[in-house]
């Protein structure tokens, strides 16, 4: 609850009550020694925040949740992939956030499955700098990690697609974006498979994922 850092708490114009809070495997009244976090969430519930509770047990929050996903213990990862499957394939994710704040543009070598680095392309190149495909100029471009910017001006990094890049030893290597690899992995978990793994019905998974994705803002506590 970021409101604790503001003098006026929830009344501050800088703070917006989350429309949805996911309480993921986190029975706060029992696991937080002073239960401060629990009271914060209850305060937000009183102000309209909806709860998605993900817990095998009927916890205090699960009993009051808008959505309670009673998953099989130990299948949280599969359920998370199910959420992502819905959000990506129904385009409910924040595309601007993906573009600006993730490494989805970075290239992965098909031959090794590892991130392509500046050191792969040029002698003396940094292992900390990564490579994207500049869709505007149709060539690789280097992301300088220390400076948090591209070494070339006006780079338009491709978020999806295949490319072929020349390495410093003269060989060529096929590459694809982190985003494409990520989406491929997510698509290995369609809702039918996730429901079979977690024992949570497909409709419940989809409804909860949509509720979370369409709530602005939303948060996950785990």
Please annotate each region the language model reported.
Residues 30-31, 60-62:
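Short, well-ordered, mixed-charge alpha-helical segments that flank or form enzyme active sites
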Residues 54-60:
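Short, polar loop motifs at secondary-structure junctions
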Residues 21, 51, 68-70, 218:
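Short, well-ordered beta-strand core segments
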């Amino acid at each position: 609850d970021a409101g604790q850092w503001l003098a006026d708490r929830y009344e501050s114009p800088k703070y917006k009550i989350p429309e949805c809070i996911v309480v993921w495997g986190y029975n706060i009244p029992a696991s937080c020694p002073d239960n401060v976090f629990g009271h914060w969430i209850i305060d937000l519930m009183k102000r309209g925040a909806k709860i998605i509770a993900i817990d095998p047990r009927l916890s205090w929050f699960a009993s009051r949740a808008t959505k309670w996903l009673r998953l099989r213990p130990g299948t949280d990862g599969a359920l998370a992939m199910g959420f992502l499957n819905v959000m990506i394939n129904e385009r409910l994710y924040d595309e601007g956030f993906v573009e600006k704040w993730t490494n989805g543009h970075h290239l992965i070598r098909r031959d090794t499955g590892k991130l392509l680095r500046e050191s792969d392309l040029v002698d003396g190149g940094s292992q900390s700098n990564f490579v994207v495909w500049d869709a505007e100029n149709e060539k690789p471009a280097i992301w300088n990690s220390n400076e948090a910017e591209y070494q070339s001006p006006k780079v338009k990094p491709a978020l999806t697609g295949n490319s072929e890049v020349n390495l410093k030893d003269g060989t060529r290597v096929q590459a694809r974006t982190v985003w494409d690899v990520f989406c491929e992995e997510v698509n290995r978990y369609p809702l039918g498979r996730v429901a079979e793994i977690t024992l949570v019905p497909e409709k419940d998974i989809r409804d909860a994922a949509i509720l979370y994705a369409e709530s602005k803002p939303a948060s996950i506590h785990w």
